[in-house]
Amino acid sequence: MVGEAIPANGAKPHITVRDLTMAFGSFVLMRDLNFTVNHGDVFIIMGGSGSGKSTLLRHMIGLIEPAKGDIFYGDENFTKAEPAKRQELLRRMGVLFQTGGLWSSMTLAENIGMLLEEYTGLSPTEIREVASLKLALVGLKGFEDYYPSQISGGMQKRAGLARAMALDPEVLFFDEPSAGLDPISSRLLDELILELRDSLGATVVVVTHELASIFTIGNNSVFLDPETKTMTASGHPKELLAHCSDPTVRAFLRRETVSESLQDSG
């Protein structure tokens, strides 16, 4: 299961990562990454601490340039795209970072509205209506005029998700969405991610180390191994749990030590 994930059931590739190397100067973090995210996937980027999960996400949205390799969205080479084409591709993406990405000095509606004001020709009334709709989609109807400090951490994450959806993205990226949430709020956020994937027809990419989320929402994944500095497995998380022979992957998915995983496989 090492190498590029194969599209299942005729699914079309949405994102293709090809021969990607991530490095900071002479220090190589990950090399030779090859995988495909298919349309409609909830794709999990997983791995141990220091494996570069969040760094990979930042490469995929253009915040960091690769030392080598390319990232494609459909047939478009995002890595080598001209600035105008890259901006066009970026408008098709929504991102929820760990903190939620909300401006504390703005209301929830204003947080969403600033993107609509910058990238659309909507009137102030229309912007308010769209902001209200996005908040309603994440269960925050009636919270338009609340400030982030006035709502809970779980609600802030949902408001951040509403902001990420402001421009109707084709791809949603989540960086450790469950960070700082209690188990109930985390489960509710997982359910919301699946609901939005289904209702919006979006592709979802999630960085997480939470096994509950990995097995609940993920249908495709890649495992980054900091020891070998490359990907050591890809595919459906439940299939990897059942059949992957790599001891590090097995240990991660079973919450075992590597030595325990080797004993189990022996």
Language-model segments: which ranges?
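A short, proline-enriched helix->beta-strand linker immediately N-terminal to the Walker B motif
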Residues: 166-170
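Helix-to-loop junction immediately C-terminal to a conserved catalytic motif
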Residues: 61
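Catalytic Walker B motif of ABC-type/P-loop ATPase nucleotide-binding domains
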Residues: 172-175
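Conserved ABC transporter NBD signature motif
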Residues: 69-78
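Conserved ABC ATPase "signature" region
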Residues: 124-143
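Conserved ABC ATPase signature
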Residues: 147-151, 155
